[in-house]
Amino acid sequence: MKSIAVTGYKNFELGIFKKDADEAVYIKETIKRHLLPLVEDGLEWVIISGQLGIELWAGDVVAELKADYPIKLAILEPFEKQSANWNEANQLWASEVLEKADYHAFITKRPYESPAQFAARDGFIIDNTDGALLVYDLEKEGSPKFFYDRAIQAKEQSNYYIDCIDFYALQEVVEDMNQTF
């Protein structure tokens, strides 16, 4: 596998409102634990769309991994000015992750017009990656459902790789990390 998309809940869908909240430490560690074996097996690219929450935390994780591994980060935003309506702290977070990216582009080269741009993003990213790592629990629907459904279709048609981190997996990492402190 050469490239993987990482996506999942937006931070506010998880009740997290700061990028460096305590919960973010556990989420980032979980993402790292799922990415690291893939990176060690030759994964070259992690693809995110730059949305708040799981994707930007994944960008932070990839930036950390770059110190020891030849992994690259691509940010493929669904449209121009995605962060224009975000608060200042979130805009800063997005720009910090963007600075760490090896590649950045807009899937539709215009500002937001309709939800179809999100569908175009999902299709483009799935069509141009070998798999996806999702922080998504089927028991708690949210914004990742659209990507998940499309990824499942790709899996059925072409063996698209899907690794879904649910809340039980996150809880295991929390417990594991708290035992080591």
Swiss-Prot record:
NCBIfam families: PRK13660.1. It holds the Pfam family YpsA. This is UPF0398 protein Lm4b_01906. Belongs to the UPF0398 family. HAMAP family: UPF0398. Coiled coil: none annotated. InterPro entries: YspA (IPR010697). The lineage of its organism: Bacteria, Bacillati, Bacillota, Bacilli, Bacillales.
